Amino acid sequence: MNPSRCRILAVGKVRRSWIQDGIELYRKRLPGLEIIEIRDSTPDKEADSIRASLRPNEHVIALMEEGDAVGSIPFARRLDQLGNQRLAFVIGGADGLTNELKGRAHWQLSLSPMTFPHELARLMLIEQLFRAQAILQGSPYHRA
């Protein structure tokens, strides 16, 4: 997994400082990872902004409650199988993603069957990206 080939497209701003601190901690550990903030709006306007931000060659991974729930090791393996593809992780707003965006995704992923604030989902995703990299590199960060 190459962080410089990954982008996170997330609706809304991170307002809680402790979440922002966590995101920055992992961003430093994942040089090249790009986070694009999409302005909060209606689901259709958010979808328009997300579509406009997606690149044609990106493998789209939509984060959604009803997506596939996988553990950290299978997540790392799946990212490894994607090789050098460019990845776009998409986190919707409070109302989630439109059906069109869900259908466009190459993979629908759930971080948990529980519901979390979207800014916390962003922190959880970036930590899992770092963990996936650590797993693939054999780092002691991940202790199963």
Curated annotation (Swiss-Prot):
S-adenosyl-L-methionine binds at L63, G92, L111, S112, P113, M114, T115, F116. The keyword rRNA processing applies. Belongs to the RNA methyltransferase RlmH family. It catalyses: pseudouridine(1915) in 23S rRNA + S-adenosyl-L-methionine = N(3)-methylpseudouridine(1915) in 23S rRNA + S-adenosyl-L-homocysteine + H(+). It is found in: Cytoplasm. Homodimer. It comes from Parasynechococcus marenigrum (strain WH8102). Keywords: Cytoplasm, Methyltransferase, rRNA processing, S-adenosyl-L-methionine, Transferase. This is Ribosomal RNA large subunit methyltransferase H. It holds the Pfam family SPOUT_MTase. The keyword Methyltransferase applies. GO terms for molecular function: rRNA (pseudouridine-N3-)-methyltransferase activity. Its main location: cytoplasm. Its EC number is 2.1.1.177. The lineage of its organism: Bacteria, Bacillati, Cyanobacteriota, Cyanophyceae, Synechococcales.
